[in-house]
Amino acid sequence: DQGKLSHLDKSKLNFVIWTTTIWTLPGNLAIALHPSESYAVVKNNGNGEMYIMAEALTDKVMGVAGISDYEIVETHEGAFFENMLADHPFLPKTSRLVLADYVTMDSGTGCVHTAPGFGADDYQTCKRYGMDMVVPVDDQGRHTDYAGKYAGMVVEESNPVILKDMKESGALLASEEIVHSYPHCWRCKHPI
């Protein structure tokens, strides 16, 4: 954290990301924040855990998580966190905090899961920061060795396993079922 958050207990500090594609989490290399939006360090008064998320989305996120006893202990612009490192939720590696203007405050947490092998914005953002490109899925749609214990699993089949593991380890703040559009091949009608 470059000493910027040294006054906080790092073992209880978590950046909260939101994703609809759980299977892409092994490919996470970064967490994107909007440079000029306000981000809050939110303390769960029930267990002492602290979460970093967009200040504008705090009430919504904490509501989804079912946490009503919380307080904002400090706020910073997204640029404050640039180049900090966060532990990956289930792999022995870190994710870099990066800045991106495409991060919006209309949904999610304001902290965007960034996996350069799975999205154009993710790729461009990581490239801008000189990060390696990782595609931890092979041509058959299975996780590669980079995905650790999920190696060899078909990506769609790994979703419930990753979710279960995150719940059991305490790395999951909340989950909910949502319906949204997803790109499909116009010829074969399969997900891309």
What is each PLM-predicted segment?
Residues A30, E37-C111, A120-Q124:
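Protease-associated
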Residues D1-P26, N83-L85, K93-V98, Y102, ...:
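Residue patterns forming the tRNA-binding/recognition surfaces of aminoacyl-tRNA synthetases
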Residues L33, A65-G66, M166-G170:
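Generic secondary-structure transition motif, activating predominantly at the C-termini of alpha-helices
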